[in-house]
Amino acid sequence: MEPILINAQVQMWSAKAGMSKSRNALIETCVGKREVKLILYFSTGKIKTLQLHDNIKSVVLQTYGEDQNYLHLTFKNNDFLFVEKLTTTDARRLKRFLDKTSQGSIRPARSDERCGEPSTSAQELNGSGSSCETNSECFESPKESEMCMFRELSLLPSSSTFLHNVGLLENQFIKRKRFFSDLAKNEKQSNLKDSIRDFEANLVVCISNEKGKERNVREVDISKPGFGFPFETNYPEDSGVDVRDLNDLITKLFSPVLLETHCIENGLEWHEYMKTYLLYPEKLWQGLPNVGNTCYINVVLQSLCSIPLFINDLFNQGFPWIKAPKDDFNMLLMQLLVLKDIYNARFRQKLLIGITKALPIFGEIFAVDRQNDAHEFLSLCLVQLKETFQRVTMMWQSENDSGDFYLLKDIFADYATINKMPVCPVTNNFEFELLSSIFCKACGLTLFKGEPSRYLSINIPQGGKDMSIQSTLDLFFSAEELEHRCEKCLYNKSVSFHRFGRLPRVIIVHLKRYHFNESWVMKKDERPILVSKYLRLSCHCSKSTKPPPPLRPGEHVKNLDLLKPLEVLGSEILKLPFNSVRTSRSKGFETINITSNRESEAQSGKRVSEVLSGKVQQENSGKGDTAHIVGSELTKETEKLKKHEEEHRPSDLDSGSIREAQKYQQAEKCNEGRSDKQISLEALTQSRPKPISQEQTENLGKTTLSHTQDSSQSSQSSSDSSKSSRCSDDLDKKAKPTRKVDPTKLNKKEDNVYRLVNIINHIGNSPNGGHYINDAFDFKRQSWFTYSDLHVTRTQEDFVYRGRSSTGYVFFYMHNDIFEELLAKETQSTSTSKG
């Protein structure tokens, strides 16, 4: 039978070596006297041989474009070969040959005498005399002797043996060169001779010495074979993700869960693991390993993962496996954010190492093995994610049929989520507009400036007592006198204040816990700041302030329907029982169609695959929108603040909470010389509050209002002018309590209230050392958890508010209406699945 010669991209997976890198190869079919084989000739000179007779489990051929096909060949030991970029003619020829071999229509001439059992493992070509004698039965003819794979070894042979074996190899390849010369007429094989020359220039000869040990004559290439985890940047030629290579893309994202069963926690297979992940989320309390001073990275990732709307916005729009970033940092970052609960600790460690290696490109401040600031890393992540989203989305929308995303766009053409108007996850959840106004005290000329922001950085007032997050925020928005020369009257004193032009879903408050002493040495500010459960922003908004984007249908869940095309890309991969011992445990969950069986009963329709188009409102507020408001806002500011404070007068809880927080501070204080490990353990084992009564437990879902402002602090924003003096007088008056309001009750009619969902804490008394941990509210389990690298512990909600007064550094507050709606949807989803 005439051999078939095909040029294509090939990729192999085996249980021992994992997934190889996708490489260009010449594929030859060979029917010998004893075996039917596929021979793969790589451009590097390597040769691999794959035995086919009585060794084929399945053959799948798929078409994904005009004259573009891929073939998935699975062997009986569950190794597989993935061949892509096949023309229609070549694909049909190869498929026909493999089908006939599988059905027994094509058999070796003497199949009963073939040596060895069917296997996909590659054989080596031994050139020494003793080796040839040993393997003479296998290599009877020059043609069969060429069916081998060269393995790279570390030792060198003697010169005499080297010459003997090189001569042997030259004789063996004479016929092959003659055979290849007949292919010159085929334009698709124009580079064949170059490949042969490359092969002969990089021969690897394996010999046996007197002790039977194999030695290497010359390595094929310097680099290691293309096996291992695909996320590691082992290949300099890979400047980014080539999304046209579908299997490579799957490998880059899902190989740890699709292909390597030992990467799954508790030995579960992919289907079982996804079933557990969907139905029993309480089993997935996963932390992140510390790979060397990376606690600041871990707390930021855990904090972002605690905002389900943000993660779902990434996932449901196909980031990163459909719309893949082109750089390592954003690719790895998105993988950890979206698939953190699927990857096990070992693989999360590899991703974190990749992130740390990619960080130095953003500046020396993020050098490897260096302690860094969590807030700076959070800011970097938000900026990079937004820029990457905009860049990839623009490429997705603008590329034509020849672009990198053409194939993926065709596959996901029926998925409305992917093709709807894009919504940036950062803009949609964290970004807000801050309107700054500068009012001239002489002529009244007002300047307006609106700028988007993703967080508020707030100073801790000097000399303040019984301060809270709410009071420091109010002070930030209070009127402030500054020196600013008026363009109209040239007067150099003005009053400035801020207002929200657009509110976010989640507002991030960064508390500046550092100050400079007399020697200009930066010190950590450990003064207790009471953690407010609720933030009230109504007094800092105007009538034109835009509300945060509302929840869209299905936004509260990950749209797992987007995983269905993986079946099209490699359905056989998902069905393979890679470990026969575990096969029995995967019954009833054979494919990645998550919406089958039990989930269909669990109201699978709630996983809506179509997300309504709702482009984030752009900041188009101009002078016409704010000019008529700011003038009156300046004169009414103090009256509004006074009225607001009188309605929400703090009770005796404030002073008591501060005293109690000071006790917690003594328990969690750390010496600067202690190690991160000691600090981490102390942070998790420090004393918890005593059990609280049922009545108090019910009140935890309501407000613990903390709303104070000292007269000396408010007077800092005043001046000798009459206007600012009146502001100070009014601000002083609000510090005098007039009536008590139950801090555990929230006014249902109150607008623009935000609720705490996450805190990043810094443990230690120096800004240049210590350890980061974070407390996060889990919507699925409806409980608070403390994350310290890999350690995850459940904590009491009351402790979060009272015990983090001196360690709280970055605070995440979610709009209360969105919080309640999201919580209700999660509760309904949980009860439905249990029912």
UniProtKB/Swiss-Prot annotation:
- SUPFAM superfamilies on file: Cysteine proteinases (SSF54001)
Q: What is its main location?
A: nucleus
**GO BP, sorted A to Z:** negative regulation of proteasomal ubiquitin-dependent protein catabolic process; protein deubiquitination; proteolysis; regulation of androgen receptor signaling pathway; spermatogenesis
Q: Where are the transmembrane segments?
A: none
Q: What ranges does the record list as Polar residues composition bias?
A: 118-128, 683-708
InterPro entries, per the entry: Papain-like_cys_pep_sf, Peptidase_C19, Peptidase_C19_UCH, USP37-like_PH, USP37-like_PH_sf, USP_CS, USP_dom
- Quaternary organization: Interacts with RING1.
The protein's name:
Ubiquitin carboxyl-terminal hydrolase 26
